[in-house]
């Protein structure tokens, strides 16, 4: 079935095979087959591409409840009829999941798993920014910012980060993500970074920007006193 349509919803696959959704999730995690689970869909990975398992497998099943907690806090900031930008990563789909299905909004994204999550929201107008596809983190890197992104000013930008550090700022693993992240920092009216506790104190290779550039940080537990003191001095609100 996947050879015909490239993707299939998890529920549809479970019904087709006569097994539970949990069984399929478990089998995909322990299988080297050229398929992966993104936003509730089983997706064929691109042929001829050596895909990193960081986004697609390892991180997707790591600290899930912590990510969901932080994501729900971030989702509470959204209001009807706003334009919302969603970063790539494995935390941002949980933000979308936490949004009320009755909420009307416009969702901007540039990653496949985030797009698949947004299309499940019945009152969401989805804008997927196209470009060169990078299978390692499932993003579309824009070839021309003037085509779409420069025409958009989100009310809120929700960012994910692999590292959160008062001195070195918010960081991630992939340099290819930076152009869109930097656009969102420049054009969005409010900047919200969503990161579970394991990201604090970490520094990754690609710098998104200083933490002072973000208005709000949503996480799953109270940071240490030194970080809270820094956040108060920097006028960054922290939710946990």
What are these regions, as identified by a protein language model?
Residues 90-93:
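Gly/Ser/Thr-rich loops at beta-strand to alpha-helix junctions
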Residues 102-104, 108, 112:
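Short, small-residue-rich packing micro-motifs
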Residues 3-11, 15-17, 21-85, 97-102, ...:
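HTH-adjacent hinge/linker in prokaryotic transcriptional regulators
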């Amino acid at each position: 079935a996947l050879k015909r349509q490239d993707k299939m919803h998890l529920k549809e696959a479970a019904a087709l095979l006569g097994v539970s959704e949990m069984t399929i999730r478990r089998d995909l995690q322990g299988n080297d087959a050229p398929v992966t689970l993104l936003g509730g869909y089983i997706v064929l990975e691109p042929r001829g591409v050596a895909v990193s398992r960081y986004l697609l497998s390892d991180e997707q099943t790591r600290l899930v409840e912590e990510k969901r907690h932080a994501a729900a806090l971030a989702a509470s900031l959204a209001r009807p009829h706003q334009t919302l930008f969603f970063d790539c990563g494995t935390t941002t789909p949980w933000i979308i999941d936490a949004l009320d299905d009755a909420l009307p909004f416009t969702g901007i994204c540039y990653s496949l798993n985030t797009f698949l999550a947004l299309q499940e929201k019945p009152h969401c107008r989805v804008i997927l920014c196209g470009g060169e596809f990078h299978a390692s983190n499932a993003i579309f890197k824009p070839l021309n910012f003037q085509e779409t992104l420069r025409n958009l000013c989100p009310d809120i930008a929700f960012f994910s980060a692999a590292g959160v550090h008062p001195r070195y700022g918010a960081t991630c693993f992939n340099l290819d993500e930076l152009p869109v992240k930097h656009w969102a920092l420049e054009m969005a009216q409010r900047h919200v970074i969503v990161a579970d506790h394991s990201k604090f104190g970490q520094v990754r290779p690609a710098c998104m920007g200083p933490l002072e550039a973000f208005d709000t940080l949503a996480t799953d537990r109270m940071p240490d006193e030194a970080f809270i003191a820094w956040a108060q001095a920097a006028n960054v609100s922290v939710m946990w």
